[in-house]
Amino acid sequence: MWNRRKLCLIAIIFTAVCFKGTAGEANLLDTRHAHVVDDLYNGCREKAMETYIHSGLLKQELNNSKGFQKAWSANAECSALIAGGIKEHTAALSVYYHADPVFLDTFDEAVETMGINASIYENDFHFKALHFLLMDSMALLKQKECKIAYRVTENKVKPAKGSTVRFGSFVSVNSNYDWLMHNEDIEGMVLYNITTCFFVNPGDHVCSKDKEELLLSPAEVFTVEEVAKRMNGDEEYIEVILKHSTLNSTHNCFSFSRSAAVVSPQWLVSVLAALLFFL
């Protein structure tokens, strides 16, 4: 009995403090995974713009990351503003074209894991401005029609048919199926066939000729329509068909709805109560 209690205690402590995810690809997650920073800033856009962009936080976050700085300034000569946006929106979109993989891994991991509570978000999520600008760009460029896009991944975890999922971070996908099948080594891989209704085509706004790459959001929820084996010539792969379901912002207006000073003690009390139960 004591061993069981000890294991439970270890599990609780691990859940409470070990929030680091797997860097690399944007993971496909069950929608019950609540650690993702999925803020859509509904109802607090102006406050977010002032807090994250005009107050100097963006500059501070840029100064704290050389990778962020490099990607941000790589396409400075491009001034194609999005409708209703500012030059910072364009710069944020260009990050996904010019950032090195190491920085994107760091950013993706932070988005996937730093939404545990307001305290961690406020103190440890160092890309608030970039996250806001990307989400706001998608809102400003709200699509009139949905679009089908694709992503090839090594991730062997296949979601169950009928389940609802989302990506753990922003994710780049390609809308050209023929190009993908001819240029990607798909043997043993997983192909996500994605119908998305909340996306942005960065190429339209960062002076790029690539009009087939789309950027998706961690706030978009998909229903798994089908999971099946497919063949492309002599290459076998798994196709996972995802259809847009809804948008879900678990942490909407995270910085403004409740302060970290309020949320953090509540979270700590709940963890301590659980610990005492097993002692």
Residue positions per predicted region:
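C-terminal GPI-anchoring signal of eukaryotic secretory precursors
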Residues: T250-L268
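C-terminal, active-site-flanking charged/polar segments
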Residues: S245-T250, F277
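Sec-dependent signal peptide recognition
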Residues: R5-A11, W267-S270
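Internal glycine-rich, Lys/Arg-flanked active-site/core loops of soluble domains
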Residues: T51-V200
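ADP-ribosyltransferase catalytic core
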Residues: S163-V221, E226-T246
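N-terminal signal peptide
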Residues: W2-R4, I12-R45, A274-L279
